[in-house]
Amino acid sequence: MTEPTTPAASAVHGGPDAPIAVLHSRIRIEERLLLEEFDRRKVAYELLDSRTAVFRPDELRLPYRGALSREISHTRNVYATRILEHAGLTVVNSHDIITTCGDKLLTTLRLLASGIPTPRVMVGLTPDAALDALDGFGYPAVTKPLTGSWGRLGARLKDHETAEAVLEYKAALTGTQHQITYVQEYIDKPGRDIRAYVFGREVVGAIYKYSDHWRTNTARGGRPQVCPVTPDLEKLLVATAEAIGEGVLAVDLLEGPDGEVFVNEVNHTPEFHGAIDVLGTGMVGRYADYVLGRLDPR
């Protein structure tokens, strides 16, 4: 690893021996595992901390051959990846994927445009408008912020009284994302979700996430177990990847009471340390294989 630097206007575009920029702000378990894999393969990389990076778009020349984004701030991720692409770099994941998957409504629209089965959604441009329409949409339902992870600020709306209390609270919050009210039908799932990992158009593996709570995120204590990748599931996952774009994706799916499978969300900077506990550490190597294949095409 080379020492991190602040991008400067005087830097030159990197050639095939130049380092890969690893965009980040925190080094979590996933980033550490990927960097250890790069070290093992003697891959040159440079840590690019989004909290200190400064760019000059009018004189942008960067000393990298490509970039891997593992940034956890959605806003910084969106703008940094666009700047890196403006400099002519291939970025995994791309600005388009990060912009789309980082916004639940944009993800839903992309899925619907490709005919991917996804839960019914209603969008109110104000919380009050959403509340007025919910009786027709139907209860129970789920409201989520447009951006965010780990199920934070998501709420299950059992009835009108619950919705009134939750949406009144949302209306008092500042920020545009709290005013745009994204409501999804509640899927009565069998105590579990599915998370599947797709690198490019290859399904790497899938896990069930079991929980007694309606939110099954492993970060919230969801228990992972191996999920068999059936031909039907693989077909759905590949179609989802084609709809979103080629990259490193974690696809969250819900099983309905009649056996239907819905794509719920698509994650662009996925955590995977819980998955490798059941799928094995080979996932890290395949992640690195995919990134290097995109950045160093032969």
Predicted segment positions?
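Protein kinase-like catalytic core scaffold
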Residues: 141, 182, 204-205, 249, ...
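Phosphate-binding site of ATP-dependent enzymes
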Residues: 156-244
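A long amphipathic alpha-helix within ATP-dependent nucleotide-binding catalytic cores
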Residues: 215-263, 285-298
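ATP-binding N-terminal substructure of ATP-dependent carboxylate-amine bond-forming enzymes
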Residues: 1-97, 296
